[in-house]
């Protein structure tokens, strides 16, 4: 029986675990998930340097991992050990669990190597209570004139319950959405729906290039954030809900310039 391993790489090179590296080195084929998330410094070249020679390394897009699992299963059926390596944690904000199930149904062994995800890292760095986060959501690029209202509605639902919202930002091919673009999209949704979900004076927390030496985590108003230079992507946003006084003090003294 072959082994299918799902390997979380963490959010940057310094968070890649020995367990992750050992698992990759014990694989014949490594499939690098390049579409689910993006790191400030992990890419396919970094993976090549991390693992021993002789490995087949494949860069995978959404089509391979979500629509062409037969390719992966064929490798396993031919007794190749396969690892799927993802930025962050391999099962947070992914659909890869379906691959584990399919491999197990075919009689193969499966293994999961967790990694430090941007979700957990951001919550810690934001100084907000982990108990007060609601559903997370992705802000997507507009398609023609259509703007998906899902993030607006999720923020609304979370705020009604006093909960914070983490906003993941869209990736399209090689373009990553910036925090500035995401907030401008949300303001356009507010102008359209007018449910008082977001105003220019609201405080938001923005993370940029988390896990790298040049990371930024700042709290500022929506209006300020639309103009702020957060530097290179990836970016991520928290829309706070009701703040406990300790959370408010932490934002004021630790995150606001």
UniProtKB/Swiss-Prot annotation:
Q: Which SUPFAM superfamilies match?
A: Tetrapyrrole methylase (SSF53790)
> Gene name?
dphB
NCBIfam families given in the database record = dph5
Q: Name one Pfam family in it.
A: TP_methylase
**Sorted alphabetically, which PANTHER family does this protein's record hold?**
DIPHTHINE METHYL ESTER SYNTHASE, DIPHTHINE SYNTHASE
- Designated name of the protein: Diphthine synthase
Pathway noted in the entry? Protein modification; peptidyl-diphthamide biosynthesis
Q: Name one GO biological process term.
A: protein histidyl modification to diphthamide
CDD domains assigned to the protein according to its UniProt record, in alphabetical order: DHP5_DphB
The upper taxonomy is: Archaea, Thermoproteota, Thermoprotei, Sulfolobales, Sulfolobaceae
Protein family according to the UniProt entry: Belongs to the diphthine synthase family.
What does the record give as the reaction this protein catalyses? 2-[(3S)-amino-3-carboxypropyl]-L-histidyl-[translation elongation factor 2] + 3 S-adenosyl-L-methionine = diphthine-[translation elongation factor 2] + 3 S-adenosyl-L-homocysteine + 3 H(+)
UniProt keyword list: Methyltransferase, S-adenosyl-L-methionine, Transferase
Q: Where does S-adenosyl-L-methionine bind?
A: 11, 89, 92, 117-118, 169, 210, 235
The positions making up the signal sequence are none
GO MF annotation terms: diphthine synthase activity
| EC number(s) given by UniProt | 2.1.1.98
The annotated subunit structure for this chain is: Homodimer.
- Enzyme class comes to transferase
